[in-house]
Structures are given as structure tokens and as C-alpha cells.
């Protein structure tokens, strides 16, 4: 599709915004077919909407076909502009909410993975309390890395995040949440599994093949991993668990995450008095953020949970 001779867009209508939301979802899902379930639309309907948007803007936004989905240069720019527009709309809605003291709008929260098994459940309880106060609030949770969560909070795409305290960024505020304790585990089938702790030497543990995380950790936790004989890596805690459960590797896991496997006799901690660490988990928000009643109520609920 060639660019229009008249590049002026004119007034942006509600229908234009709806088309842009559909476009944003397609980009984030990675393809038309992957966006079907998220949008609740058929692939043909999505294609029609994209055609309408491209005609409205006078430019080709993406390539689609047998070669797969790919944004054009113009598509990447429109996607960035769409993020800015929707964030501004949400900011406007947040300010109006503050004026009327009604909880409406969205809470976009980023969380690192495998926290749902924490026994304290402060995030779960706070989200429940928020939904009770504002039934019309839409809660959007994204599971991703600490770095992406911090960047998302900084640029306004996320209202709040839950991250380990590693290297605090100057533009963010970090509020203590709780400590997450981790121990070193092996699984049934590993050479150390059936042996009592008293019969296992520290040097044997240090020599065993281990899996290391490829994501950032606080210095103390990183030091614990580095002393092991790391011969494999994983991008997240679930990947760590996969490799430990093979019986070929030892590795650190959060105690709450490993608890069910321990109870089932599939995992055991190794010399827990020696091999353990704790990570401080925090709630992160942006400094100087605009008033947002939904976010403030969520933070209040976290504080009392």
C-alpha cells in the first residue's frame, strides 16, 4: 500500500482508537492468528480492521502472509505512537477518576514469575481488595523480567511492578514487600538425593553439575550461584526447575516454589544450613507519577495485607 498523497490524519475518532488498540494487540501477540483469542475476533475480521486502519493512516503497517508477520518501518513508528497515545488516554482517565473518587480504568502490573506460590500472598490479597472496591477496574498482569518491569514503570506502560531489589534506578521508588528464601535442590535420581546431609561433603556439592540463572540477581544471591559448578543456564526459575528435575543438575529454587515437589518426594534441599540465600522483593512505582486513584488504592491494600 503506497503512502497517501495527503499525510494529514485530521481528527482521531473513537473508531480510530479502537483500530489502534487492535493493532497494538496484534503486534504484542506477534501475529493475526495469535491475537484471535485475545481480541475475541476471527482472523478475517482482524484482517479487515487492519485494512481499515492502513487506509485511514494512508500507509502500510505490516507485512503478512506465508513469510509471517512483520512490521514495516512506518508500522514500528505507529506502534510507538499508539503506546504513547493509549498511555496518555489512561493518564487522562486516571485524573478524572481522582476527581470523582470512583475506581475505574486499568491497573497494569508487571510481576516476575513464580511468585503465586508465596504463602504470604500479599499481591493476591491486594488485587482482591482492589477489585472489591472497584468492580469496573480492569487488571492487566504481565509476567516478565525485572529489567523489563522497571523500564515499563519508567516509561508509563506499567503502573506498578514487583521486582527483586538489585540495582535501584533513580527514577523509581522501591517499597519493601517481603523476603523470598531460596535453597539448593537436587531431584530424585541424582547421586546426592538418597544420602543424608551428614554424609555429604560441601566439596561434593560444589563439584556437582549445576544450573545457573541467566537473569540478574542481587550480589549475595549471585555469589551463591557462582560458587557452584555451573554447566547449564536458564532464563527463568521454571527453566531452572526443568533442569533440576532431570536428575542431572543441582540448582537454587525459591523454597515456596519447590515446596510441592519436596512434599511429593521429587526434590530435596542440599545442606540447607550452608546453601541458602534470601532476596528482598519490592513494589516499584515511578517517582513524580501523576495522581492515580486505582494505583493508590492498590498500594494501600498491599500495605495492610
From Swiss-Prot:
Disruption phenotype: Cells lacking this gene grow normally on putrescine, cadaverine, and GABA, but growth on beta-alanine is completely abolished. Residues 15-72 form the HTH lysR-type domain. Pfam families: HTH_1, LysR_substrate. InterPro entries: LysR_subst-bd, Tscrpt_reg_HTH_LysR, WH-like_DNA-bd_sf, WH_DNA-bd_sf. CDD domains: PBP2_LTTR_substrate (cd05466). GO terms for molecular function: DNA-binding transcription factor activity; transcription cis-regulatory region binding. GO terms for biological process: positive regulation of catabolic process; regulation of DNA-templated transcription. SUPFAM superfamilies: Periplasmic binding protein-like II, Winged helix' DNA-binding domain. Gene3D superfamilies: 3.40.190.290, Winged helix-like DNA-binding domain superfamily/Winged helix DNA-binding domain. Disulfide bonds: none annotated. Keywords: Activator, DNA-binding, Transcription, Transcription regulation. Involved in the degradation of beta-alanine. BauR activates the transcription of the bauABCD operon. Belongs to the LysR transcriptional regulatory family. PANTHER family: HTH-TYPE TRANSCRIPTIONAL ACTIVATOR BAUR, HTH-TYPE TRANSCRIPTIONAL REGULATOR. This is HTH-type transcriptional activator BauR. The gene is bauR.
Amino acid at each position: 500500500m503506497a503512502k497517501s498523497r495527503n499525510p494529514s490524519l485530521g481528527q482521531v475518532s473513537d473508531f480510530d482508537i479502537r483500530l489502534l488498540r487492535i493493532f497494538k494487540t496484534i503486534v504484542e501477540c506477534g501475529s493475526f492468528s495469535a491475537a484471535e483469542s485475545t481480541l475475541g475476533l476471527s482472523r478475517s475480521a482482524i484482517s479487515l480492521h487492519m485494512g481499515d486502519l492502513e487506509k485511514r493512516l494512508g500507509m502500510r503497517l505490516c507485512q503478512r502472509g506465508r513469510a509471517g508477520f512483520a512490521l514495516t518501518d512506518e508500522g514500528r513508528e505507529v506502534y510507538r505512537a499508539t503506546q504513547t497515545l493509549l498511555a496518555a488516554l489512561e493518564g487522562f482517565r486516571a485524573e478524572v477518576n481522582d476527581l470523582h473518587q470512583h475506581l475505574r480504568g486499568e491497573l497494569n502490573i508487571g510481576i516476575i514469575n513464580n511468585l503465586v506460590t508465596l504463602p504470604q500472598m500479599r499481591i493476591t490479597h491486594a488485587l482482591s481488595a482492589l477489585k472489591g472496591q472497584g468492580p469496573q477496574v480492569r487488571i492487566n498482569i504481565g509476567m516478565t523480567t525485572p529489567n523489563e518491569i522497571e523500564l515499563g514503570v519508567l516509561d508509563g506502560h506499567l503502573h506498578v511492578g514487583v521486582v527483586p531489589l538489585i540495582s535501584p534506578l533513580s527514577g523509581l521508588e522501591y517499597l519493601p514487600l517481603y523476603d523470598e528464601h531460596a535453597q539448593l535442590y537436587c531431584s530424585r535420581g541424582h547421586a546426592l538425593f538418597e544420602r543424608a546431609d551428614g554424609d555429604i561433603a560441601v566439596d561434593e556439592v560444589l563439584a556437582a553439575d549445576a544450573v545457573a540463572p541467566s537473569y540478574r540477581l542481587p550480589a549475595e544471591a549471585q555469589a551463591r550461584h557462582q560458587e557452584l559448578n555451573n554447566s547449564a543456564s536458564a532464563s527463568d526459575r521454571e527453566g531452572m526447575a526443568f533442569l533440576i528435575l532431570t536428575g542431572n543438575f543441582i540448582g537454587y529454587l525459591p523454597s515456596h516454589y519447590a515446596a510441592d515437589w519436596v512434599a511429593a518426594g521429587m526434590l530435596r534441599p542440599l545442606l540447607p544450613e550452608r546453601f541458602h540465600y534470601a532476596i528482598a522483593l519490592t513494589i516499584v512505582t515511578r517517582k513524580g507519577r501523576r495522581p492515580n486513584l486505582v494505583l493508590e488504592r492498590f498500594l494501600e491494600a498491599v500495605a495492610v495485607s
